[in-house]
C-alpha cells in the first residue's frame, strides 16, 4: 500500500525558501487562497509551503486548513510545471477541497509565465 502523503521533497521546509518565494514570487489571488508562485530553479518538481497566521483561528482550524491545502496540492502536483508555491488563506473560512484543487490547477500555471514580482 502506498503512502498518500505529500513527500518531504515536495515541501518548502526552511525559512530561507519561504522568504525567497515571498520576495521573488508573483502574487495570484484565488477565491479561497492567496498564492505566491516562482519558477523552480533546479528541478521540474513543484514544492509547496503553507502559511497561516494566528488571526485565522485556533490551532485546530489552522491545522485543518493546512491539511486540506496539502491534500489538494498533492492531487494537482503531477499536472503542474516545476515551481515553488506559498499558499495563504483569504478570509477565515475553511476551503472547499474540490474548488481549491481547481483553483490551484488553474492559477499556478497562469502566474508562472509572468514570474516577475508583483504586489498582492
UniProtKB/Swiss-Prot annotation:
Its EC number is 3.1.26.5. One of its GO terms (biological process) is tRNA 5'-leader removal. It catalyses: Endonucleolytic cleavage of RNA, removing 5'-extranucleotides from tRNA precursor. Keywords: Endonuclease, Hydrolase, Nuclease, RNA-binding, tRNA processing. It comes from the Bacteria. Belongs to the RnpA family. RNaseP catalyzes the removal of the 5'-leader sequence from pre-tRNA to produce the mature 5'-terminus. It can also cleave other RNA substrates such as 4.5S RNA. The protein component plays an auxiliary but essential role in vivo by binding to the 5'-leader sequence and broadening the substrate specificity of the ribozyme. This is Ribonuclease P protein component. It comes from Chlamydia trachomatis serovar L2 (strain ATCC VR-902B / DSM 19102 / 434/Bu).
Amino acid at each position: 500500500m502506498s503512502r498518500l502523503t505529500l513527500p518531504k521533497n515536495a515541501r518548502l521546509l526552511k525559512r530561507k525558501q519561504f522568504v525567497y518565494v515571498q520576495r521573488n514570487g508573483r502574487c495570484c489571488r484565488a477565491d479561497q487562497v492567496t498564492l505566491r508562485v516562482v519558477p523552480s530553479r533546479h528541478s521540474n518538481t513543484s514544492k509547496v509551503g503553507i502559511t497561516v497566521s494566528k488571526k485565522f483561528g485556533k490551532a485546530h482550524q489552522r491545522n485543518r486548513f493546512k491539511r486540506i491545502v496539502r491534500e489538494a496540492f498533492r492531487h494537482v502536483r503531477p499536472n503542474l510545471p516545476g515551481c515553488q508555491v506559498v499558499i495563504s488563506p483569504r478570509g477565515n473560512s475553511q476551503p472547499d477541497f474540490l474548488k481549491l484543487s481547481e483553483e490551484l490547477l488553474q492559477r499556478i500555471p497562469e502566474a508562472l509565465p509572468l514570474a516577475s514580482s508583483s504586489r498582492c
